[in-house]
């Protein structure tokens, strides 16, 4: 799940908060996949 993924990345990258870094990652932000594209 996403929490376990965050802990795994945190072990590799110290002094960062990976859960927050990837919070807005994805094709679209917002509920149900609607909203402005986040990545091109």
Swiss-Prot record:
An example GO BP is: arachidonate secretion
Question: Is Secreted one of the keywords UniProt gives this record?
Answer: yes
Known SUPFAM superfamilies for this protein?
Answer: Phospholipase A2, PLA2 (SSF48619)
The record's tissue-specificity note reads: Expressed by the venom gland.
Tell me which UniProt keywords the record has, alphabetically.
Disulfide bond, Secreted
Top-level taxonomic group: Eukaryota
Q: Which Pfam families match?
A: Phospholip_A2_1
**Major localisation:** secreted
Its cellular-component GO annotations read: extracellular region
Q: Which InterPro entries match?
A: PLipase_A2 (IPR001211), PLipase_A2_dom (IPR016090), PLipase_A2_dom_sf (IPR036444)
Q: Where in the cell is it found?
A: Secreted
Coiled coil segments of this chain: none
What role does it play? Heterotrimer: Snake venom phospholipase A2 (PLA2) heterotrimer that acts as a potent presynaptic neurotoxin by blocking synaptic transmission and synaptic vesicle recycling. Enzymatic activity is essential for the neurotoxic effects. May act by binding in a calcium-dependent fashion to neurotonal pentraxin-1 (NPTX1) and neurotonal pentraxin-2 (NPTX2), but not to neuronal pentraxin receptor (NPTXR). Also binds to taipoxin-associated calcium binding protein 49 (RCN2), a protein localized in the lumen of endoplasmic reticulum.
Please give the subunit comment from the record.
Heterotrimer of alpha, beta, and gamma chains; non-covalently linked.
User: Hey, which family's this protein in?
Assistant: Belongs to the phospholipase A2 family. Group I subfamily. D49 sub-subfamily.
Any idea what this protein is called? Neutral phospholipase A2 homolog cannitoxin beta chain 2
Q: What is the lineage of its organism?
A: Eukaryota, Metazoa, Chordata, Craniata, Vertebrata
